[in-house]
Amino acid sequence: MKILVVGANGQLGARCCALLVEAGHDVRGSVREPARGEALRALGVETVLADLTDTSSIRAAASGAEVAILSANPVVPRAGDRPALVEEGLSRAPAVLAAEGVGRIVLPSVPVTDVDEAVPFVRARRRLEDALAELRAETVCVRFPPFMDVHLALAGSSIPLRGAQNATVDRPSPFLRSFRKSTGTLVEDRGLILVPGRRSHRNAFITVDDAARAVVEAATRDDVGGLPHATLEVAGPQPLSWDEVAATYGRVLGRRVRVLATPAVVYAVAQKVLRPFAEVPSNTMALNRYGASSETAWRNVGGGLLDPASMTTVEEFLQEKVRLPD
């Protein structure tokens, strides 16, 4: 099967490419610069230059593809990126892909919350989901809880990044790098974990690897429930509160780990104050607000796409990572 991965050098997209190649599919991955495709080409991925802000490049990338995975997003922009322009390009992409004959489009997405409309990325994602539902092509929106590889790192730990390739948290984003410089090892160094929202909030955390496996299943299986326009929630193996995450870190590190929680209202105020003159920091505060306002205590482990017994728990993830070199 010929499968296009849009945003192939991102953490999720790159893992999808690797799994698809392993499964014997003909994989094409879009990247914005040739150098970003070197590792993908080494895996056997055909790389093409495409930019979501250039519709013609997306059209060319889609030529001959049977399935497309839209893994690109502007959540962690590089210096000089314009998130709003990327979102505009993403909003056009489904119709372009369908017009080129793509028969199924898979969109990794995020949980629904009461603050979706106040968060630019999430608001745009809902519009994208709506656009997919209007297409003649088959579409699958796969909503995920927080990724362990990302959210446990942003909570103040470098452990989730050990051995990671194409890590979202390591992208060359000036704002994120500044934040990580002061908070990147708080858990290991000071026994302190930074939590958005209430410490009692529960999330069915999932690894990027398990999420990629779910996306690949959604892209390639004939028996996906809900087609032609499916929306699936894929829970990780167990819902944990942030207190339970801290306790898990404590067992892994052999020390007490305390929770420092920040209320959603703090992020909402910061988002509003920063909006007129600092788009990226404002959007980041909006995402923190979103995270602080949501819970994913889902019980549908694997979402019908993965065997629950095959999925990685938070403790298994951290135990595996802590054995790797820094």
Annotate each PLM feature.
Residues 239, 244-295:
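Terminal hydrophobic/aromatic helix or amphipathic segment near a protein terminus
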Residues 48, 142, 258-262:
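General small-molecule cofactor/ligand-binding pocket signal
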Residues 2-11, 15-26, 55, 76, ...:
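Oxidoreductase cofactor-interface core, primarily capturing Rossmann-like NAD(P)-dependent enzymes
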Residues 45-48, 65-66, 123-125, 157-161, ...:
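Short, hinge-like loop/turn segments at secondary-structure boundaries
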Residues 29-100, 114:
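NAD(P)H-binding glycine-rich loop region in Rossmannoid oxidoreductase-like domains
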Residues 297-326:
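Amphipathic terminal alpha-helices
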Residues 55, 59, 90-94, 208-216, ...:
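Short, amphipathic alpha-helical "lid/cap" segments that border enzyme active or binding sites
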Residues 6, 30, 71, 105-110, ...:
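SDR active-site strand-loop-helix element
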